[in-house]
Amino acid sequence: MVSDSLKICTVCAANNNRSMESHKQLKDAGYNVRSFGTGSAVRLPGPSVDKPNVYEFGTPYDDIYRDLTSQEYHKMYESNGLIRMINRNRHIKRAPEKWHNNASAGKFDLVITCEERCFDLVLDDLMVRLVNKDQADTEIKQAVHIINIDIKDDYENAVIGGKGILKLVNMIHEFRNTNKQRRLDHDFDDESDTILEDQMMKLLAKWQQEHTHLPTLYSVAYY
């Protein structure tokens, strides 16, 4: 585990391809990471465009794997990479999880979405949570950085996008460590570890120079 890792979350629609590939890369690098989907259900390619394979969130990847490999179309799923994707997922965590049901996961420092619609849904949900928060709750609001990195939903682009996400998280982590060391060196005890909005925007701008193929959006929300 990376020392002093941010609590990170990756999000796509079905929590199967883009968010899971970036989850894997961040996990392999030692970061504290979870992943979720914003869709109403887990929709995966089927024998035709109008016949997807649909599962409820929480259906174990092992069950999805067994179902797909038992179908008469399993050769198609092998050739289009679907079986490979589910096999990868079941070695990362138990089942796809829905973003809107993740209150028990606690608060994240950084949420990275992989599609603009997911970005909007995450922001909307966090706003609803804040509005519905118990008025008697005096807990200090915690900022969460929401970054969207637009990734095409196929296996190859998910790998490319995952590498880009890992690079960005490495930059953010290095920035935090440098700031922390500076405070220790100069006894700046009154400064917090929180990355400010303008600091994050500068990091994103620097990252974007090397990742022009991955458009980004950025916002800050609160718990």
Curated annotation (Swiss-Prot):
Keyword Hydrolase: yes
InterPro entries: RNA_pol_II_suA
Subcellular location: Nucleus
Keyword tags: Hydrolase, mRNA processing, Nucleus, Protein phosphatase
Main location: nucleus
One Pfam family, short name: Ssu72
Subunit description: Component of the cleavage and polyadenylation factor (CPF) complex.
Protein name in UniProt: RNA polymerase II subunit A C-terminal domain phosphatase SSU72
Protein's organism: Debaryomyces hansenii (strain ATCC 36239 / CBS 767 / BCRC 21394 / JCM 1990 / NBRC 0083 / IGC 2968) (Yeast)
Chain's gene name: SSU72
